[in-house]
């Protein structure tokens, strides 16, 4: 079995997903400090902005995730005289072009998103001309079982997309929550997009807490 096949079949917990997303983001936005030290990566994982949900991970949790990911070919440690640093290997392990890597990173950090959200949030990371370019790359990821298309529920204006590398139970929880939200809007009126995102963040936070307890 090739490295690509092994990595592609892997499933990662919420902490590992946050670690990968943070490394991908900082490679693009802070190239002068990338690869990252463990301390810098912990700060990146726990950012209050551009993270859904906001997490409060320890160095031990991030270090454990890095070692697990290293064993799957998704991260690599660079030994240094002053400090050891970590880099991701997502693009190489999954054979992704730069545009696909950016989209996976955004979905790792913020979960299900619309095409317009991905376009807006990618402006510091990659130069997409429009949502059609994003949709084309997402369709390629979906064809390889790396991403999922989530049809809009009742009361929603747009479809959403998310990565498919998390725990299957977490993905099912997201889908179930969306179905429940859609039913609530049909019977009880409209619910704001902010409310939807808040519910998604609460679900993800509970899943992250469960992953911490199990770890």
Swiss-Prot record:
Regions that span the bilayer: none
Protein name: UPF0502 protein PP_2442
Source taxon at top rank: Bacteria
Lineage, opening ranks: Bacteria, Pseudomonadati, Pseudomonadota, Gammaproteobacteria, Pseudomonadales
InterPro entries membership: DUF480 (IPR007432), WH-like_DNA-bd_sf (IPR036388), WH_DNA-bd_sf (IPR036390)
Pfam families found in the cross-reference section: DUF480
Species in which this protein is naturally found: Pseudomonas putida (strain ATCC 47054 / DSM 6125 / CFBP 8728 / NCIMB 11950 / KT2440)
Similarity comment text for this entry: Belongs to the UPF0502 family.
């Amino acid at each position: 079995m090739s490295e690509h096949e092994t990595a592609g079949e892997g499933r990662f917990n919420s902490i590992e997903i946050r670690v990968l997303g943070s490394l991908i983001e900082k490679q693009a936005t802070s190239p002068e400090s990338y690869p990252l030290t463990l301390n810098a990566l912990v700060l990146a994982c726990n950012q209050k902005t551009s993270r859904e949900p906001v997490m409060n991970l320890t160095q031990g949790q991030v270090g454990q995730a890095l070692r697990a990911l290293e064993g799957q070919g998704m991260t690599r440690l660079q030994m240094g005289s002053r400090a050891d640093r970590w880099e991701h290997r997502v693009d190489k392990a999954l054979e992704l072009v730069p545009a696909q890597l950016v989209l996976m990173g955004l979905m790792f950090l913020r979960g299900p998103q619309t095409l317009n959200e991905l376009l807006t949030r990618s402006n510091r990371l990659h130069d997409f001309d429009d949502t059609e370019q994003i949709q084309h790359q997402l369709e390629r990821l979906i064809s390889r079982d790396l991403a999922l298309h989530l049809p809009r529920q009742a009361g929603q204006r747009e479809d959403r997309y998310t990565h498919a590398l998390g725990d299957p139970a977490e993905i099912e929880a997201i889908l179930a929550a969306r179905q429940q939200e859609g039913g609530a809007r049909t019977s009880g009126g409209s619910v704001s997009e902010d409310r939807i995102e808040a519910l998604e963040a609460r679900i993800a936070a509970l899943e992250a807490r469960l992953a911490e307890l199990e770890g």
